[in-house]
Swiss-Prot record:
Protein name: Adenine phosphoribosyltransferase 1, chloroplastic
Complex and partners: Homodimer.
Catalytic activity: AMP + diphosphate = 5-phospho-alpha-D-ribose 1-diphosphate + adenine
Name of the top EC class for this enzyme: transferase
InterPro entries in alphabetical order: Ade_phspho_trans, Adenine_PRTase, PRibTrfase_dom, PRTase-like
pH dependence: Optimum pH is 8.8.
Organism classification: Eukaryota, Viridiplantae, Streptophyta, Embryophyta, Tracheophyta
Inactivation phenotype: Male sterility due to pollen abortion after meiosis. Accumulation of free bases of cytokinins and enhanced resistance to exogenous cytokinins.
Entries under PROSITE patterns matching the protein: PUR_PYR_PR_TRANSFER
Note: Plants with reduced activity of APT1 and increased levels of cellular adenine show enhanced stress tolerance and improve growth, leading to increases in plant biomass.
Species assigned in the record: Arabidopsis thaliana (Mouse-ear cress)
Keywords attached to this entry: Acetylation, Chloroplast, Cytoplasm, Glycosyltransferase, Plastid, Purine salvage, Transferase, Transit peptide
Domain of life: Eukaryota
Keyword Transit peptide in annotation: yes
Amino acid sequence: MQTIIISPLVSHRLCLARAVPCNRLLNNHHRAPPSIRLSNHRSTTSLRLFSSAAASRDSEMATEDVQDPRIAKIASSIRVIPDFPKPGIMFQDITTLLLDTEAFKDTIALFVDRYKDKGISVVAGVEARGFIFGPPIALAIGAKFVPMRKPKKLPGKVISEEYSLEYGTDTIEMHVGAVEPGERAIIIDDLIATGGTLAAAIRLLERVGVKIVECACVIELPELKGKEKLGETSLFVLVKSAA
């Protein structure tokens, strides 16, 4: 499996500052290892660029210019809310990215530039923030948008795939007939943490004969090693967490 990164800069969305025993499983999108201590500053002074040489050891760079100013703009537009939704959680809020029209536009443009000539007919968005980024990408590349939702959110007949959480399981669903065998799809979410949700989305689409071209996220939290759950499916991210 291959991970392609435009520029690794900031951690995103749900990152814990609380201590958690290393042998406990991590809830997707909600937990980070105890070694991660993240700044709650929005300024780019709190961000760190990885050199292209260092990054290339683990990941192929998607652009020759790893200091693309658009990436810095996207990274700095994400604010951190401490102790939300629970004490100890550093919630990295992408709503501030959406309020910044240039940063939001650049986010979509970077994905569109990557996928516009790859014969993609399906953009599958993972609930809930995949619904923000998926539709404009789908419209721009001439693909349909397929929502992948939590249980009992979609009317009519659905097909489901279960995945593991820290305590118990969850399920992701999509409509029967939303995709056809042989279609080419990308799966969009704002964040990959432990990778459980994206892995379930891959399995669900592959069960009905869809070819997964790639998973794409705004942010990767590499410390959680979520990309390892994606098997042979490559991962494309715009920014990467820096502890």
